[in-house]
Amino acid sequence: MKEIRFSDTTLRDGHMSLWASNMSTAMMLPIVERLDGAGFEAFELMSGSHFKKAVRELKEDPFERIRLVTERAPNTPARMILGRINVFGFDPMSMFRLFMRLSAENGMGQCRISDPWNALEGWRFRVEGAREAGMGVVLNLTYTLSPRHTDEYYAERTRLAKTLPIDRMCIKDPGGLLTPERTRSLVPTVLANAGDTPVEFHTHCTTGLGPLCCLEAIQHGIEIVNTAIPPLADGSSNPSIYNVAANARALGFESVIDEDALRPITRHFTAVARRGSGEAPALPPV
């Protein structure tokens, strides 16, 4: 039975998509140990917008967040998302390198890198910056809809990505634009050109098709899927770990995630959401 593994997006893309990045460090800390023990490949924690949000609105130190969270998760790499060179504005390269070094020194283990144009030179300096800081690298192949973005285009981009010192690739569908039919041709194309480089799959539920696209990706060879934990899943966020894992099992695959360990996380963030809406119930023990 083929194993399907998962990377978690709850602490980054989940609340970025549904709570406008308003999850504070204090909201995260009670559940980190459970997240760490559930069997995820990695968990997303920060992106450039989260640094700005933490400083400008939440009045928090983002590097302190990284340190406090990663201290509680020794078994699972924390992952940051890097889509551009600037962090707080139009930053010089020296600031970019300092940002990468401080992120790694405070506990960030991996960097998932995008370039809006899937351009080799755009990828290259970001990959070099992550490697210099000592982080593992996951390179995004960003999906969109246009006459240019054909299977042949993604085959060529995948081959270019393999020329860089990366650990993994990720088919990234940030707009939730993939359909099951398009997934059926895209995934085999990328896998055929990725060789022995592992490939993850990341989509959103914006159109409601995200969970179905995940299942199509799994059936066509993807072994690592990005999911979120409810209530920070679905909608404009990523598919629910419960949904994807259950349906993967129904198709004959094995999930390595301990879903029972995740139930208290769901209860915790549901209570956090209710408190934010004014209902203010007591937070359940995690």
Model-derived segments and spans:
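Catalytic cores and adjacent flexible loops of soluble metabolic enzymes
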Residues: 1-112, 116-286
